[in-house]
Amino acid sequence: MKRTYQPSRIKRKRTHGFLARKRTSTGRNVLRRRRAKGRERLTV
């Protein structure tokens, strides 16, 4: 059986990357929350 996780750097960046987060209002909320929490890495 094929595994569900098939890593791809492009897909990873496009869906979870900084620019992807920045693009939507909810994504910007995610960045805001992570900054408030003091996360070292905001995105992938």
Swiss-Prot record:
Keywords, sorted A to Z: Ribonucleoprotein, Ribosomal protein
Gene3D superfamilies, per the entry: 1.10.287.3980
Biological-process GO terms, alphabetical: translation
Classification via PROSITE patterns: RIBOSOMAL_L34
PANTHER family, per the entry: LARGE RIBOSOMAL SUBUNIT PROTEIN BL34M, MITOCHONDRIAL RIBOSOMAL PROTEIN 34 FAMILY MEMBER
Compositionally skewed regions (Basic residues) per UniProt: 1-38
Name of the protein: Large ribosomal subunit protein bL34
UniProt GO MF annotations: structural constituent of ribosome
Underlying gene: rpmH
Lineage: Bacteria, Thermotogati, Thermotogota, Thermotogae, Petrotogales
Transmembrane segments: none
Keyword Nucleotide-binding in annotation: no
Signal peptide: none
One cellular component term from this protein's GO annotations in UniProt: ribonucleoprotein complex
Region (Disordered): 1-44
Family (UniProt): Belongs to the bacterial ribosomal protein bL34 family.
